Amino acid sequence: MPELQPAAGAVANPQQPRIGHWKQKLLAARTQLREELSARKSPRELLRHQAAVVDRLLKEVWAGHAMPRDVTLAAVGGYGRGQLFPYSDVDLLILLAAPAEAELARKIEELLGTLWDIGIEVGHSVRTIDECITLAAADITVQTTLLEARLLAGRRALYSRFVRRVSDELDPADFQQAKLLEQQQRHMRYAESNLEPNIKESAGGLRDLQTVLWIARAAGIGRSWSELSRRGVITAIEAREIQQHEQFLQSLRIRLHYCAGRREDRLLFDFQTPLARAFGLHDRPHRLASEQLMQRYYRSAKAVSHIATIVLQNLDARITPPSDKEYHPLNERFGIRDELLAACDERLFERKPSAILESFLLLQRHPEIKGVSAPTLRALWRARRLISPAFRKDRRNREQFMQLLRSPERVARMLRRLNQYGVLGRYLPVFGRIVGQMQHDLYHVYTVDEHILKVLRNVRRFAVPEL
């Protein structure tokens, strides 16, 4: 069924006398929310509060239009999650028991017209359950949207049938595969937006966090970071870290919306300085406020990417348990399982810190290894704190690092991986200080660490092709 639009030149809306009242309520609520942001309230609370305000208003408008009993109103998308950013669309699903006849179509048009008149920017669809299921089968975006549906008003029995059908038609393994492909394509699409990254869509952004929770929810494993922690998918420390990064990104996006005065997810050059001021940052002798903010963003995005990789691997092991993959030892400390490097035990790096750099040597020397297993990746991330002055002075560690640099192959790739896992900046503190550091001008497209790694890669290409 095509989406219904408020008809141009239609008869006057019977709710016209109440529209001014509803409009004032919405404006007052939005003003209060902006004041709460200035009071440094939790971004999660702000997003939920904004959604709750719109919930109450929608229910009031729905009741005012006396919608038929066999019609249901549901929140979907981000609004369905109970989160609403200042200038985001309010995504709605009007669920029908049967295709709409003329009178019902007219009432829906009036309802949508009222919502637009009071200042709610609505993204909507009007569908039967069968139409929802058909579209979801053909489009992973629609399927994801329906997964987060939340009842607002109308017939509960119809909504319950809809939820059961969506659940029955959902295959967790297929859903996971489709979402991971979608994420890979999205990362490629936004790979060149280094100077002005997209808080929502770029790698390490909010969409990556949502992808993890979508997959977990589809598999019935959990709907929140605390729930995933209780289920053993992530550790309590990882849950706390990822919530901290999520709240920072949410706070940044909220302020960006207010700064732009519209729905905007790109950290455009012109907004970076006022955003930094909104976070209480000030210029220093050698670092602008905007550069401080962007470094925090880049480091947060890197951490999100790393932890999300661990969680996605753990979810994959539960959704599609691998057949009994053999462990092929490389030495006493490491082996290969399912094409991934695996440590003999998760406490290896604590017992033998030199194994940290050894793991990268093995990745460099064995191109058949496609990555690092989740337990080893987690242990490696935790072991960064062991890279101390004594670690750097240790002869074995110095030799291993030089072996990485002297290798005829995959040097640039390993340096990038060392940086990605937070090891390079720990081993070379001078490099650590410039991780995520950008220069606030239109000439320097990459952060300083990324620029250095690209230069090293290009210099090597003059003599040795990276295989």
Protein language model features and the residues they cover:
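A nucleotide- and high-energy phosphate-metabolite-utilizing enzyme signature
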Residues: M1-L467
